[in-house]
Amino acid sequence: MKLMRKNETREFLIEDIEFPAVGVAFYNDKKVYIKGAVPGQKVLARVSKVRREKIEAKLKEIVTNIPGAAQPKCPDFGVCGGCVHQFLPYEKQLEFKEREVLKLFKDAKIEGFEYLGILGSPEKEEYRNKMEYTFGDFVKGGELTLGMHAKNSGFSIVNTDKCNIVDEDFRIILKTVVEYFRKKDLPIYKVMQHVGYLRNLVVRKAKNTGEILIALVTTSQVDFDLTELTEILKSINYLGELKGILHVINDGLADMVRGDKIVTLFGQDYITERILDLKFKISLFSFFQTNSKGAEKLYSEVLEFLGDVSNKTVFDLYCGTGTIGQLASKKAEKVIGIELIEEAVEAAKENTKLNNISNCSFIAGDVAKVITEIKEKPDTIILDPPRPGVSPNAMKYVIKFNAPEIVYVSCNPKTLVNDLGVLRAYGYEVEKVKIVDMFPGTGHVETVVLLQRKII
């Protein structure tokens, strides 16, 4: 069989799937990875990388679909780079996600635990509480667009005003803003040249309270009066309640949403969400689970895994705005949360006051550094790290604490199994595993693991 070459387009039969939602075909006994493809499909894909150990290809067309496949409800599916599996019935999505995660556990030789299944999202559509949209154009020099990056493209932006993973308030805000700026002839920000004005639109909406926060992100390269746009956005008849409109000045070179300066154009600079009877203040850049209803399910599982922590001290590492820690404080004697992002810690402290919680404290700093300075010892540790997992330095001290139990909440099962391997090498056993889907239509998933220290 001849060698496969880069940019060659050919037909593949998808035989397996690996995290995150990457279909696997075979060529000369070598794996061919095709993002978005699923087992049972026959697809056309263009080869993008040829390596000694693997081949990567980009999905171009589905030649034969799997039984039960449906027409995606989103008109931009396949063009927008956001969702990958909207054509699959939800039960099939869960089946594939479960298969991907359990394969990682099997490959890492992690076994002997109680597997508690996969829990689906309460909402399959309109579940997101935050979106970061980008200004741009779909065709270079074309009409202004506002939305998500196009599939397999670093620069084309798809206008996503019909997106069905957010509710109507998001859609009307996006549509209003893009139509307004189409009449103003203002330059979009060009990342490579570092010139332009319009960068991003951020919308946050608390699903349980209905509170809405809108932020327009621009550079300082144009002096433009936003009073008219502010009044237009205030006049909309929302399903929820508009609480604030912000103007974020971002002159940074990186292609990411951040702020050098934040100006409040209307109202306040935060919204409040309610999760499991507690209130949480969410500012523009606060980390908060993007599926509020799903978060309630996820946190309920975490609390179940914690078990009886009365008379116990719980460390909540990578605590963000302190959501899990504050929920755990209702059961624990004491909770100490540690988080790198100072703004998130300030929000966590405000949330403890909001909820009249007195047994929960938060420290800002690098987890790896702060835990070396804490004199108290935890009875239980909650780990909820970002996608890269627990840093090696932090892991050293997690192990040194010698806590009887660890509850690990992971948004990346690949780094999860790596970290579990380290913890197992130092005397911990994986007791329980539960998968929780927070992101229908996408390849992402959460996993909750209970570890117990072996008595030697």
UniProtKB/Swiss-Prot annotation:
Instruction: Spell out the InterPro entries in the cross-references.
Output: MeTrfase_TrmA_AS (IPR030390), NA-bd_OB-fold (IPR012340), SAM-dependent_MTases_sf (IPR029063), TRAM_dom (IPR002792), U5_MeTrfase_fam (IPR010280)
Residues annotated as domain TRAM: 3-61
What molecular functions are annotated in GO for this chain?
A: 4 iron, 4 sulfur cluster binding; metal ion binding; rRNA (uridine-C5-)-methyltransferase activity
The answer to keyword S-adenosyl-L-methionine applying to this record is yes
CDD domains annotated for this entry? AdoMet_MTases
Matching entries from Pfam families are given as: tRNA_U5-meth_tr
Question: Which keywords accompany this UniProt record?
Answer: 4Fe-4S, Iron, Iron-sulfur, Metal-binding, Methyltransferase, S-adenosyl-L-methionine, Transferase
Q: Is Heme tagged as a keyword?
A: no
Q: What are its GO biological-process terms? A: rRNA base methylation
Alphabetized NCBIfam families for the sequence? rumA
What protein is this chain from? Answer: Uncharacterized RNA methyltransferase CA_C1435
Q: Could you tell me which species this protein originates from? A: Clostridium acetobutylicum (strain ATCC 824 / DSM 792 / JCM 1419 / IAM 19013 / LMG 5710 / NBRC 13948 / NRRL B-527 / VKM B-1787 / 2291 / W)
